Amino acid sequence: MARLGLAVCAASFHLFLLLASTSSLRRAPTEADTANHARRTAYHFQPAKNWQNDPNGPMYHNGMYHLFYQYNPHSALWDIGNLSWGHSVSGDLLNWAALDTALDPTSPFDANGCWSGSATILPGALPAILYTGIDASKEQVQNVAFAKNPSDPLLREWEKPAYNPVIALPADVPGDKFRDPSTAWLGRDGLWRIAVSAEVDGVASTLVYRSKDFVRWERNAAPLHASRAAGMVECPDLFPVAERGEDGLDTSANGAGGVRHVLKLSVMDTLQDYYMVGTYDDAADAFSPAEPERGDDCRSWRRLDYGHVYASKSFFDVRKNRRVLWAWANESDSQADDVARGWSGVQTFPRKMWLAKDGKQLLQWPIEEIKTLRRKRAGLWQGTRLGAGAVQEIVGVASSQADVEVVFKIPSLEEAERVDDPNRLLDPQKLCGEKGAAVRGGVGPFGLLVMASGDLHEHTAVFFRVFRHHDKYKLLMCTDLTKSSTRAGVYKPAYGGFVDMDIDDHKTISLRTLIDHSVVESFGGGGRACITARVYPEHVATSSSHLYVFNNGSDAVKVAKLEAWDLATATVNVVVGDHHGLVAPALELEPTRTTQ
């Protein structure tokens, strides 16, 4: 059992004083408060009100976690007023206290908005923020801000030097296509480096800049990545991963042995995040992909999440020696709904990330702290058989706020659906739409029905389906929203991706689903494939939701394991009377464990 350090104790005292104060961002909810809306999440990060989008500058400093985020303090819509940096602090990544905005558009170099960027801890434990400012001429420039009092655990005040911008708009880049500086890393030559997204002469590019002092920056002649096909890319994230094990690495880690790098890019024309594992040479500032056959068009790279997320951002959590990922999950109903709720946008539940043994893909898993929210448990008998058409309810949990883990055993793959045309396997989302949960298959569909009404007129299906092409099997994972709501005007697609694993060898597949009212996050195959969805069922206004396990394949499957837990409500930017969890917990949890 670890002891709380002095920094954490000091942070606890500061948070106690903070929570005793009042602010428009952190007031106690009332009957009419937007926090009481039926679709508001219970343990996902979101401000008390108004618009949020990209996660920015997550870091751990002086015993506290910090999350900044794109925030509109004026409206639940993006385009009413100019964006600021929202700022919240936590001791456990679950419970959050909202602070006043960290950066506001008050200077000529950011007069029209403080857009996305990153945080870096400089020598001397000085936190620094690099961010994109929309200047008085509405051009995108890169600015720096420093913590005014680095010893303040809450980092409540930030200084924007008058010498900003530190990187002006380049002559070969349009004024609206130069943004999102990354977390900085130190090269072995002692120079700081950052990646910045830009469109250079019509080519989507990830530029590298170098600096001795974090103020004067020089651009590398060659980009880290460039593609004529992809369109504008955003929010670049270059970070190291260990070749073996689950531990994270400091962003500046490099070396010939034991370290790979990941380049993640967010693509505007698809609103999706893509990544490639490879090697990074800091002498030339060059990235070499491990799968060059995927090409320069990052839309053919691996997907970080096959669902409704964008603008992801990771950081190295030095406290737990892990890399943690956030991503923005926007609403998918209407702007009128945003205004009526008074808020828009949530962040995904934080995920631990590490490199799979194949050296090509990342594994993602909810951080272990979620176990502290688990309350009532329910499940099924091990070995429960699900025959063709079986639908079995899991009773005993509040299924609108739950954590569900299930492992399916596939007795045989003989009835897997045959696919003769390989082109049908190129678009998994289209395949999920054609082969939804209601379409009878051979091996699958089998999985979960979540946020379901008692009559099943509304439900979200999260499931697997096995296909066979020649002598190889392909495991498809889908989240089917077509029956998620009876409302018109709600985006209800079928999301999907292939799980990169040998299902013929294992014949077992795991599924973990986090349910949080309007958010459904699913992790297939131990985190090999992830799908995030936003759902808006109508029945929640008058009745409770239900949880089912099902099989609509002609072949039976077995439930080797199924456990479901109620999850408690975290304190997320709305004060409810105490500050439990806002300091780092003394109890260390067990190491992360995953199954196939």
From Swiss-Prot:
Any single GO CC term annotated in Swiss-Prot or TrEMBL for this entry: apoplast
Residues carrying sugar: 82, 330, 552
Domain of life where this protein originates: Eukaryota
Location relative to the cell: Secreted, Extracellular space, Apoplast; Secreted, Cell wall
Chief location of this protein within or outside the cell: secreted
Catalyzed reactions per annotation: Hydrolysis of terminal non-reducing beta-D-fructofuranoside residues in beta-D-fructofuranosides
Keywords: Apoplast, Cell wall, Disulfide bond, Glycoprotein, Glycosidase, Hydrolase, Secreted, Signal
Coiled coil: none
Alphabetized GO MF terms: beta-fructofuranosidase activity
tRNA processing recorded as keyword: no
InterPro entries: ConA-like_dom_sf, Fructan_Metab_Enzymes, Glyco_hydro_32, Glyco_hydro_32_C, Glyco_hydro_32_N, Glyco_hydro_beta-prop_sf
Catalytic residues (positions): 54
Documented EC number(s): 3.2.1.26
EC main group: hydrolase
Tissues where this protein is expressed: Expressed in roots, leaves and flowers. Weakly expressed in seeds.
Binding site for substrate: 51-54, 70, 78, 115-116, 179-180, 234
Similarity comment text for this entry: Belongs to the glycosyl hydrolase 32 family.
Function: May play a role in sucrose partitioning during seed development.
Name of this protein: Beta-fructofuranosidase, insoluble isoenzyme 7
